[in-house]
């Protein structure tokens, strides 16, 4: 007998702001070969000798700035999304995290124990990147194939320019815009340039020439940069915001390798130096507010902008539990269930 279910997947969070919990989380996160994609021996050395001795304390302090009485903002919001979606669909809905708790392995085992035969895997990443969308899918399929390889699975593809996703972005963001804003900055999570090249199936197109993201190419199906540009273009088109009052940047770089640019922190300082006074910043790569939006942009970003002359930087909240975003997820689940009977 068929039993269907959907699995919402997000990144994850430490269990608390304690340095020990943050260290455990960072160790798991940065041990992922699709995140820190270097030689395994070098990765271990970097973690043990460079990153884990100092970064957990710094990150714990940052997490303490955003932690709520309910816990991690990402986990709290993800649970709200899960509950809202569950209440609007007939199928069972589960929530899992790539790192931390509830772990992918735990949730997959629960899905199996509950007798699910058909699973709709829904990575909550609009854009394809090996360090987010890809690793979430690979980890989930590894757990399924190890435990119940006969389970039938379907996958929500990156939805970076899906009209309903763009509409949800517009619906959630536009109420925060003001007529006297000088600029709307789209700040996407950054990734190393080598990740773009590794995700290019041709190994010859992405970042090989200036127009690589403009001219249509099959490589765009797995090109994070192209997909971020498309989200921005689609948002501008649907919202009606003048393109000349927008900009794009990439945040959260780690280590010294070249990452996608321009870098958000550099851009915020430049905007202040150039006399731009009032900006809004939205982060479309994130569907839920988290450390990278609340602290990195809403706190540190404000300081970076103001220290060079900027006056007002406001973080535009992510879609979080906005009805249009919840409707997007509900509709995708319903469409999937309908496809099973066709």
Which role does the model predict for each range below?
Residues 1-342:
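Active-site-proximal alpha-helix that buttresses catalytic centers in soluble enzyme cores
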